[in-house]
C-alpha cells in the first residue's frame, strides 16, 4: 500500500493523527489529533507549500499550518512569505516596506505609512517585496502601483499614458520624441495619468518642451510642478484696446493658441500673439 499517495512527505497516518510523531504537540492546529490535511492532496491549503514541508520544516514540528494557507492571518500566504524571506508567523510584516519602493507623493520629505508600498501590497500586485523595481523599467514598484501603471511590465515605461506630450511640429500626431513618457514623468516627479500636474492649464509636456527651449539668457522657467507660471506672461505679448485697456496673454493661453511663450510675435507678422488670438 502507498502510505503517501500525494507525495507530500507526510504519510496518511500523520495527516490524520500526529500523536506518534516525536516533537509534535497534539491539537496544535486542530482537534482530536487530526492535522486537517488531505492525504491525497500535496498542498491541502494551497499556500505553495507541501503539507510535509509545513509539518517537518522546523525543529519543533509545525512551522505553518498545513490546513491554513495563511497561518498568521496577515493576508499573505505562508508559501509566498517563505519564498520571499518573510515570517509566516509574524503578521506585522504585512505593513512593512522591506525594499523601500514607496514614494513621497505629497513631497514632504517623509515616507508616511500610506505612501509605502507594503509587503501586502506587493503580494496583491504580484511584485517582489525585496526588489524595488520588479520589472526593471526604472520606475519603482510603489510609484507605478500608486498611479495605476503595471509594476510587472516594462512596456509602460515608454508610454505617454495621459497624452501630455507636445506636438511641436504640429502634424497632429505625437511622435516618440514628442511624448512625455511615464519614465520622464517619474524623473520629473509629475503625475503620469494627469496631463496637468500643477493645475495651471498648461500640460506637463508643453511646459517641459518650452522650458528646454527657452532663450539662452532666460532665467525664468516653465515648471510642471509650479501652479503659478501658467498665469504669467513671459513675453509680454498682450495688447491694449482702443479704450486703453490692457489684455493679458498668459502662458496658458499661449499653449491654447499654440504660440511661443518666449516670443511675443511667433509668426513675425508685426502683430502680437495676444492681439491675433483675441481678434
Each predicted region: which residue ranges?
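Extracellular calcium-associated, cysteine-rich motifs in secreted modular proteins
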Residues: 1-279
Amino acid at each position: 500500500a502507498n502510505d503517501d499517495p500525494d507525495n507530500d512527505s507526510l504519510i496518511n497516518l500523520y495527516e490524520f493523527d500526529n500523536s506518534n510523531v516525536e516533537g509534535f504537540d497534539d491539537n496544535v492546529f486542530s482537534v482530536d489529533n487530526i492535522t486537517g490535511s488531505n492525504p491525497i492532496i500535496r498542498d491541502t491549503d494551497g499556500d505553495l507549500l507541501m503539507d510535509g514541508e509545513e509539518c517537518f520544516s522546523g525543529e519543533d514540528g509545525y512551522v505553518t499550518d498545513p490546513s491554513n494557507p495563511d497561518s498568521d492571518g496577515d493576508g499573505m500566504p505562508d508559501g509566498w512569505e517563505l519564498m520571499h524571506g518573510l515570517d509566516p508567523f509574524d503578521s506585522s510584516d504585512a505593513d512593512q516596506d522591506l525594499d523601500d519602493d514607496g514614494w513621497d507623493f505629497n513631497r514632504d520629505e517623509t515616507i508616511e505609512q500610506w505612501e509605502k508600498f507594503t509587503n501586502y501590497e506587493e503580494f496583491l500586485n504580484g511584485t517582489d517585496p525585496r526588489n524595488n523595481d520588479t520589472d526593471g523599467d526604472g520606475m519603482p514598484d510603489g510609484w507605478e502601483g500608486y498611479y495605476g501603471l503595471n509594476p510587472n511590465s516594462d512596456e509602460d515605461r515608454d508610454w505617454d499614458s495621459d497624452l501630455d506630450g507636445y506636438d511641436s511640429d504640429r502634424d497632429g500626431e505625437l511622435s516618440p520624441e514628442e511624448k512625455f513618457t511615464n519614465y520622464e514623468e517619474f524623473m520629473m516627479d509629475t503625475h503620469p495619468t494627469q496631463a496637468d500636474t500643477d493645475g495651471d492649464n498648461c500640460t506637463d509636456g508643453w511646459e517641459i518642451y518650452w522650458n528646454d527651449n527657452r532663450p539662452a539668457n532666460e532665467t525664468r522657467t516653465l515648471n510642471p510642478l509650479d501652479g503659478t507660471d501658467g498665469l504669467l506672461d513671459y513675453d509680454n505679448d498682450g495688447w491694449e484696446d482702443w479704450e486703453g485697456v490692457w489684455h493679458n496673454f498668459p502662458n496658458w493661453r499661449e499653449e491654447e493658441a499654440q504660440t511661443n511663450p518666449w516670443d511675443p510675435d511667433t509668426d513675425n507678422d508685426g502683430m502680437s500673439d495676444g492681439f491675433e488670438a483675441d481678434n
